């Protein structure tokens, strides 16, 4: 019989992209730099009092620029600019093509020749492939995928709990939302 359980979420690695206080709660974020939902999650996590670990879950079938942007982020990381590049890409989802990417890298002061060689090199491809493989093995099915804490508690339960709490805080819907049984439709 085949074991269909997912593998555990890999723990923190020395080469992970990490931002936030060492003593803050750990959030593992598998994201796609071309994903608008990831951009929203990125902005929310950026302002939260958490320690974020970013790993690539580049879904080229859904976002054609996903792999190119993931490789670019790794090339920027080689020059100490991973988070700056990600922040810029997520803040401007309408400009993901190469001319805008190059302008962004130039504005960050990156060595453009090195950046180009690194983004096309085997290290960036291997890193992105490892992250994507780990995400799939751990059960990720889309982006963004977020796990909380070292045990890798999947965020779905947390999102549902948060959604219920926020719905209670906000109150009944207004502005065109109509109640249909126990749900609301717009």
Where are these regions (language model features)?
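N-terminal targeting signals for export/organelle localization
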Residues: 1-11, 181, 185-186
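Short secondary-structure boundary micro-motifs
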Residues: 2-3, 58-59, 129-131
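Short coil/turn linker and secondary-structure boundary residues
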Residues: 2-4, 80, 96, 110, ...
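Intrinsically disordered, low-complexity sequence elements enriched in Ser/Thr/Gly/Pro
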Residues: 3, 17, 53, 166-167, ...
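A residue-level detector for conformationally permissive "hinge/kink" positions
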Residues: 3, 12-15, 101, 134
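A short beta-strand-turn-helix
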Residues: 7-26
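C-terminal cap of thioredoxin/glutaredoxin-like
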Residues: 26-31, 37-47, 106-186
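Structural alpha/beta surface segment adjacent to cysteine/selenocysteine redox centers
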Residues: 28-106, 116, 175-177, 181-184
């Amino acid at each position: 019989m085949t074991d269909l359980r997912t593998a555990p979420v890999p723990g923190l690695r020395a080469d992970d992209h990490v931002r936030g206080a060492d003593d803050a709660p750990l959030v593992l974020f598998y994201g796609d730099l071309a994903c608008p939902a990831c951009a929203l999650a990125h902005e929310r996590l950026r302002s939260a009092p958490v320690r974020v670990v970013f790993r690539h879950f580049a879904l080229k079938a859904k976002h054609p620029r996903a792999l190119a942007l993931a490789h670019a982020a790794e090339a920027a990381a080689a020059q100490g600019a991973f988070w700056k590049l990600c922040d810029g890409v997520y803040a401007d989802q309408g400009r993901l093509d190469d001319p805008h990417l190059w302008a962004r890298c130039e504005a960050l002061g990156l060595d453009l020749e090195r950046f180009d060689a690194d983004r096309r090199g085997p290290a960036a491809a291997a890193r992105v492939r490892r992250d994507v493989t780990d995400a799939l093995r751990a059960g990720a099915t889309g982006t963004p995928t977020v796990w909380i804490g070292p045990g890798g508690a999947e965020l779905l339960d947390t999102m549902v709990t948060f959604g219920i709490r926020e719905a209670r805080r906000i109150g009944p819907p207004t502005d065109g939302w109509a109640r249909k049984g126990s749900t609301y439709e717009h």
